[in-house]
Curated annotation (Swiss-Prot):
Pfam families: LHD_TRPY1 (PF23190), YVC1_C (PF23317). Keywords: Calcium, Calcium channel, Calcium transport, Coiled coil, Ion channel, Ion transport, Membrane, Stress response, Transmembrane, Transmembrane helix, Transport, Vacuole, Virulence. This is Calcium channel YVC1. It is a multi-pass membrane protein. The lineage of its organism: Eukaryota, Fungi, Dikarya, Ascomycota, Saccharomycotina. It comes from Candida albicans (strain SC5314 / ATCC MYA-2876). Its main location: membrane. Disruption phenotype: Leads to hypersensitivity to oxidative stress, increased sensitivity to killing by macrophages, reduced ability to invade epithelium cells, and attenuated virulence in a mouse model. Shows defects in hyphal maintenance, hyphal growth and flocculation. Prevents the localization of the Spitzenkoerper to hyphal tips. Enhances mitochondrial depolarization and apoptosis. Vacuolar calcium channel involved in the release of calcium ions from the vacuole in response to hyperosmotic or alkaline stress. Required for activation of CAP1-related transcription of oxidative stress response (OSR) genes, but also for maintaining the stability of both the mitochondria and the vacuole in a potassium- and calcium-dependent manner. Contributes to pathogenicity. Plays a key role in hyphal polarized growth and re-orientation to host-signals through its contribution to the localization of the Spitzenkoerper to the hyphal tips. GO terms for cellular component: fungal-type vacuole membrane; plasma membrane; vacuole-mitochondrion membrane contact site. It comes from the Eukaryota. One of its GO terms (molecular function) is voltage-gated monoatomic ion channel activity.
Length: 675
């Protein structure tokens, strides 16, 4: 059967009227049958662990492992890593090694996890096992950087979900992409190949297979000029467009919240339109949190989930009091109404800060969020120590207060201890309580709080900030990767972004009584209506990108090439908005080629105006090669490039010495024969 013509201007047909296999011919990927099984994955991991155990017998400096010219992770070592995957051949498509090497990144991350477990259980060798874990991550990054086949790297190595047999039980399938994020392996996440894969996932050029939940596939429609191909509700699943939609809905949510909080009348009336919309938004977001947690599990929980859940709890309390006020009368109604709006007002800081959740894909905001999250985690230790100290002193003060058989100052004591944390307390607060015992005890409390605990907090914050700033770029990459996977891990086949998930909830009972094809059609048209404004933007954006992608494929370069027109390369760049002389894409491609040719011709003419200006570029390149440091050659033999030339000269002298020794032996034999 012929492949669906994506360039055809098809009508907006529902999924049931389109051949699924042909239409999903717009995607193509790797079949799971051509990937190693769980037992084979375990053997590959064991081989890699044996290799790393041998090459890291003692503790080296981390720089000797992570540096780009590492003498430890030399080319022969990386060749052994490939051999550890098994199979025959050199990794080319069609060989068995091609099949097994696709799991190398996953296996290396799994080995890294094993080393982390060993470091935790065997504290005496903690540093050695941590270094081996670092080595496994570094090798994984090297494997990613060395792979030049985009499809193989993205689909087989990073996105495919592999499973490993541990103690006779197959573990839950997970991809190297997801494992790196869950392990927070910034070394792997920061590699260029990994980031390109994340970029393709973010743009929807890589999507999950509709037939195999463990595989991802390339979206062929990225280069299509068909309006129908891009004006499809399924494209809402793209993380980029989900993020845009969520930002837009969050701004609306914030505007409605502001209207409700700041226009509240003293007269307690019924729930108005804006309150109704606010409450529906809130219910939709809470429902979405429950569904995602149910499907994804504990991996879904994070800093922002705790932040949002706290805000939703406050809003839920406000809604409950508001509903109670409507159903009450007299003074009770007024009281509940006041409580409702006062609680609602307390959610304002969280509501505004929530916008950062959707803006963290931008580097400035993202780096700031990473620092904030790290500092909040470091604060846990401080607050634990603070809690223990406060409880201890609280018990002491209460004991002093009750020494006369009466308990009269418990509330004042507790308030004073808490106020001391924020600097709002004084020594006079305890001056009248069982002198001089309470005063002496309070001096100790103030000393411990201000001199010891506060300095611990400052040190923790300083360490956290320094660690993040030093590795800010990779930490930002990790944040974006986590955000992208958060969208991709969403379980919905039909994506209804809150509060539109309430519509899905209302129409779900219909699916119990109609056929599967009819249910698909209903969801298709519902999403087509509610998302039509965004789909218009998506279509415009993707049609613009499609022209550049077609140009890249014509030139034989990756789809994401020529996105930036650099000043030093006259042949790169592509103006997506240029209409060309004709409507056909080939007219635009020919026009761009003509522009490049003309620019190169003008450049050469300008260079040749002075005959003495030109140099022999071939000879110039050879001279450059002669003075370049032998980094590549040193890596091949596993030595530091700084001593490579010395070692090379020693090797030459050794060879000459061996020749002299051999000639002397031959001469000695001849003399003995003559004698």
């Amino acid at each position: 059967m012929s492949e669906l013509d994506l360039e055809e201007n098809n009508p907006l047909l529902p999924p049931s009227q389109i051949n699924d296999e042909n239409y999903e011919g717009s995607i193509f990927g790797e079949d799971a049958r051509f990937c190693p099984n769980s037992r084979q994955v375990f053997r590959i991991c064991s081989n890699l662990k044996l290799l790393i155990d041998k090459i890291i017998p003692i503790c080296f400096k981390e720089d000797e492992i992570t540096s780009s010219n590492s003498a430890i992770l030399s080319d022969p070592v990386i060749d052994l890593v490939y051999q550890a995957a098994g199979g025959k051949g050199d990794g080319k498509e069609g060989t068995s090694s091609y099949k097994y090497r696709g799991s190398l990144v996953f296996c290396l991350l799994k080995v890294c996890d094993w080393y982390w477990q060993q470091a935790e259980f065997e504290l005496s060798d903690n540093e050695l096992y941590s270094l081996r874990a670092l080595t496994a991550q570094t090798i994984a990054a090297i494997i990613i950087e060395r792979e030049k086949r985009d499809k193989y790297l993205f689909l087989n190595m990073l996105c495919h979900r592999y499973t490993i047999c541990v103690n006779g039980v197959d573990a839950t399938p997970v991809s190297a992409l997801e494992m790196a994020v869950d392990m927070h392996s910034t070394i792997v996440i920061g590699s260029s190949g990994y980031q390109r894969c994340i970029k393709w996932l973010w743009r929807g050029w890589i999507i999950q297979s509709s037939t195999d939940p463990h595989s991802y596939v390339l979206y062929k429609g990225a280069a299509s000029q068909s309006f129908r191909t891009h004006f499809d509700p399924a494209r809402i699943k793209t993380p980029l467009y989900q993020n845009i939609l969520e930002i837009f809905l969050s701004i609306i949510y914030l505007i409605i919240f502001t209207i409700v909080v700041n226009t509240h009348s003293t007269l307690t009336g019924d729930i108005d339109f804006f309150e109704t919309v606010l409450y529906l938004f809130t219910v939709g977001y809470i429902l979405d949190e429950f569904i995602k947690f149910y499907h994804v599990g504990w991996n879904y929980l994070g800093f922002w989930n705790a932040f949002n859940d706290t805000m939703y709890c406050i809003l839920t309390v406000a809604v409950c009091f508001r509903i109670a006020s409507v159903n009450s009368h007299g003074a009770t109604r007024i009281k509940y109404d006041e409580i409702s709006f006062r609680v609602l007002a307390c959610a304002s800081p969280l509501m505004w800060s929530r916008l950062l959740l959707f803006l963290d894909a931008y580097k400035f905001v993202g780096a700031m969020i990473v620092v904030l999250k790290t500092m909040m985690k470091e604060s846990i230790l401080f607050f634990f120590l603070l809690f223990v100290v406060i409880v201890g002193f609280l018990q002491g003060f209460i004991g002093l207060d009750s020494s006369d058989g009466k308990n009269e100052a418990t509330q004042r004591i507790l308030i004073s201890l808490v106020k001391a944390v924020i600097g709002g307390s004084s020594f006079e607060d305890m001056g009248n309580l069982v002198p001089p015992y309470a005063s002496v005890l309070y001096y100790f409390y103030q000393f411990m709080l201000t001199v010891i605990l506060m300095n611990i907090l400052i040190a923790l914050y300083s360490t956290a900030y320094a660690a993040i700033v030093e590795n800010a770029t990779d930490e930002y990459f990790a944040l974006v990767a986590h955000k992208t996977l958060r969208y991709i891990r969403a379980p919905d086949q039909n994506l209804y972004v809150p509060p539109f998930n309430l519509i899905e909830l209302l129409i779900t009972p219909i699916g119990w009584f109609v056929s599967t094809s009819t249910w698909k059609n209903i969801n298709y048209y519902v999403m087509l209506v509610i998302y039509s404004p965004l789909l218009a933007y998506i279509t415009s954006d993707e049609l613009s990108n499609a022209r550049r992608i077609q140009y890249n494929r014509f030139k034989g370069v990756p789809d994401d090439a020529n996105e930036i027109d650099t000043e030093w390369d006259l042949t790169d760049g592509y103006d997506e908005d240029s209409p060309g002389d004709g409507d056909d894409c080939w007219d635009r491609i020919r026009e761009r080629n003509s522009e490049i040719t003309e620019e190169l011709r003008i450049q050469r003419e300008g260079e040749r105006q002075d005959p003495e200006f030109m140099i022999n570029t071939h000879q110039f390149s050879e001279k450059i090669d002669k003075i370049v440091k032998p980094v590549g050659q040193a890596s091949k033999v596993g030595v530091n490039w700084q001593i490579y030339e010395v070692i090379e000269k020693i090797d030459k002298l050794t060879n000459l010495l061996e020749v002299v020794v051999a000639e002397n032996k031959e001469l000695k034999k001849r003399l003995e024969n003559k004698a």
